[in-house]
């Protein structure tokens, strides 16, 4: 399995996406200026791809808030000046796109543990503490996207299909 650092799109791809995808033009209208974050310290914004194989493989981690990664030392950003958002776009998938989330969770103060994996501290959350009825699956077709702040509890979803799920995503910051 490739680590996140090995899945970051090259800088020229990022510039191409930012110039060609309408969603980034729309985001600039809403937020004025967006800055794609560089969590992997590569010297440019990190837009990365993800491939998740179908069951029986479990190429997903536990549910998490992206904020927890930042709190544990991934990336550097002045939280007093900037707010973080995540953009997740389905490239290939079926009705259930492999993205699950808990509506309203940005307002919940949830406990988590952490582990050292791939030379980074990563949050570990016990999903059983939520109850299945609180977890929702994003549904749609390829091109479906979700934009959320970094305090939404979310994660990848193991799918019982015959084809893998492919997505691209990035975190961006805007001035408060």
Task: Give, region by region, the residue ranges found by the protein language model.
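Short, solvent-exposed loop/turn segments at secondary-structure junctions
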Residues: 54-56, 68, 92-95, 106-107, ...
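Aromatic-acidic/polar surface patches that form glycan- and anion
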Residues: 13-24, 80, 132, 136-140
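Short, well-ordered beta-to-alpha junction loops that form the rim of enzyme active sites
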Residues: 47-49, 104, 150-152
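Catalytic core of non-heme Fe(II) oxygenases with the double-stranded beta-helix
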Residues: 58-138
